[in-house]
Amino acid sequence: SNRPMPLNTYQFKNMIQCTVPKRSWWDFADYGCYCGRGGSGTPIDDLDRCCQVHDNCYNSAREQGGCRPKQKTYSYECKAGTLSCSGSNNSCAATVCDCDRLAAICFAGAPYNDNNYNIDLKARCQ
């Protein structure tokens, strides 16, 4: 689909490029049961588990009134592959920034299995 990317998704993409510079962020946009389009079943590996944790983090951020993680912009820095969230973020922005920061760090530490890209969600993510 050619929907414009929500602003925060753009920031999350940049965070991923900070911690995993050798890979395209697209590699993470459709991976396993939780990265990108999915959101059900048992995560199929460590990287997929990173995305499940990120989904859960966004869900708990939504419980703060009026906090919409996919639209929320925040202030952060990437220095030499290290991410930090700015102290000037309001509570929603701080929460969402930390969700994204922890996921990007998790991605950097998890092996990438090409066989788990663009899997059949119906068959494998019940």
From Swiss-Prot:
Q: Which cofactor does it need?
A: Ca(2+)
Question: Where's the active site on this chain?
Answer: 54, 100
Q: Which GO terms describe its biological process?
A: arachidonate secretion; lipid catabolic process; phospholipid metabolic process
| Location(s) in or outside the cell | Secreted
> Per the UniProt record, which EC number(s) apply here?
3.1.1.4
| Binding of Ca(2+), residues | 34, 36, 38, 55
- One MF term from GO for this chain? calcium-dependent phospholipase A2 activity
Q: How is the cofactor bound?
A: Binds 1 Ca(2+) ion.
Catalytic activity, reaction form: a 1,2-diacyl-sn-glycero-3-phosphocholine + H2O = a 1-acyl-sn-glycero-3-phosphocholine + a fatty acid + H(+)
Q: Which cysteine pairs make disulfide bonds?
A: 18-78, 33-125, 35-51, 50-106, 57-99, 67-92, 85-97
Sorted alphabetically, the Gene Ontology cellular component annotations on this record are: extracellular region
SMART domains linked to this entry: PA2c
Task: Please state the protein's primary subcellular location.
Answer: secreted
| Pfam families registered for this protein in UniProt | Phospholip_A2_1 (PF00068)
Q: Is Metal-binding found in the keyword set?
A: yes
Propeptide span(s): 1-7
Concerning InterPro entries, the annotation shows: PLipase_A2, PLipase_A2_Asp_AS, PLipase_A2_dom, PLipase_A2_dom_sf, PLipase_A2_His_AS
Which keywords describe this protein according to UniProt?
Calcium, Disulfide bond, Hydrolase, Lipid degradation, Lipid metabolism, Metal-binding, Secreted
Q: In which tissues is it expressed?
A: Expressed by the venom gland.
Keyword Transcription regulation carried by entry: no
Record-stated family: Belongs to the phospholipase A2 family. Group I subfamily. D49 sub-subfamily.
Q: What does this protein do?
A: PLA2 catalyzes the calcium-dependent hydrolysis of the 2-acyl groups in 3-sn-phosphoglycerides.
What quaternary arrangement does the UniProt entry report?
A: Heterodimer formed between two homologous isoforms: isoform 1 and isoform 2.
Its protein name is: Basic phospholipase A2 1
Species for this entry: Naja sagittifera
